[in-house]
UniProtKB/Swiss-Prot annotation:
The lineage of its organism: Bacteria, Pseudomonadati, Pseudomonadota, Alphaproteobacteria, Acetobacterales. Disulfide bonds: none annotated. This is Large ribosomal subunit protein uL2. The keyword Ribosomal protein applies. Gene3D superfamilies: 2.30.30.30, Nucleic acid-binding proteins (2.40.50.140), Ribosomal protein L2, domain 3 (4.10.950.10). The gene is rplB. Belongs to the universal ribosomal protein uL2 family.
Length: 276
């Protein structure tokens, strides 16, 4: 998919850059693979805000996407590629030889009419899923399971991928886009290829209204609040906040480590690259 640039006939279109989705399916999704979805507005079951700056936006329908790919050795034909409002990647509708329909994450270079299959004996081509132990070292993969049978968790958003860099003693080593090197069980499934829609990172929203369509509300800084609202609030005139950056609840931000799962620390060989 290419990027769409616009003539500046309005102020908001001057810098707008969007993904051209003209090649995607323009109809409705398969009804049996969808479910209604209620907007929470960032509130929990007590009505309290647990995720700030969320609310509004276009009504969405949830699509059931198969992240497990456990229907082994049954070829499926790609019927079409579709837009999914719940994720940045595109999804593909596939039809198995026995007639079952399913949605999967669409990898790059997958198109209608292609045949995909999952299983240990599948070919190494985009869209095919198999255990990491059956994938050659150096292959680009996505939708990687962290536990066998739990469904893919790693490399699922638009344009992402990982690389299988080694196999040893029943474990597979994978290198993530962040630079992290970690191991997972060799029985875990992964799908060959990189996730579709790599141009998603080049989108320029262009105007506040488009953010509202996506359910994003205005984000205001702590230094413009009152002391009752934020640790950076208050002061006479414009201030810098007067302290190292913290969250509204007083915890350090900007690089503060929050990982606490020591049980799986041994599965991370090298931590991700730090930002500048």
């Amino acid at each position: 998919m290419a990027l769409k640039h616009f003539n500046p006939v309005t102020a908001s279109l001057r810098g707008t850059v969007l993904v051209d989705r003209s090649e995607l399916w323009k109809g409705k999704p398969v009804k049996t693979l969808t479910e209604g979805k209620h907007s929470t507005g960032g509130r929990n079951n007590h009505g309290r805000i647990t995720s700030r700056f969320r609310g509004g936006g276009h009504k969405q329908t949830y699509r059931y996407v198969d992240f497990k790919r456990r229907k082994a050795d049954v070829p499926a034909t790609v019927e079409r590629l579709e837009y999914d409002p719940n994720r940045t990647a595109f999804i593909a509708l596939i039809k198995y030889q026995d007639g079952e329909l399913s949605y999967i994450l669409a990898p790059q270079r997958l198109k209608a009419g292609d045949v995909v299959v999952s299983g240990a004996r599948a070919d190494i081509k985009p869209g095919n899923a198999m255990p990491l132990g059956a994938i050659p070292v150096g292959t680009i993969i996505h939708n990687i399971e962290m536990k066998p049978g739990a469904g893919g968790k790693i490399a699922r958003s638009a344009g992402t991928y990982a690389q299988l860099v080694g196999k040893d003693a029943g474990y597979a080593q994978i290198k993530l886009m962040s630079g992290e090197l970690r191991v997972v069980r060799a029985e875990c499934y992964a799908t060959v290829g990189a996730v579709s829609n790599p141009d998603n990172s080049n989108i320029h929203i262009g105007k506040a209204g488009r953010s509202r369509w996506l359910g994003r509300r205005p984000h205001n800084r702590g230094v413009v609040m009152n002391p009752v609202d934020h640790p950076h609030g208050g002061g006479e005139g414009r201030t810098s906040g007067g302290r190292h950056p913290v969250t509204p609840w007083g915890k350090p931000t900007k690089g503060y480590k929050t990982r606490t799962n020591k049980r799986t620390d041994s599965l991370i060989i090298r931590r991700r690259n730090k930002g500048k």
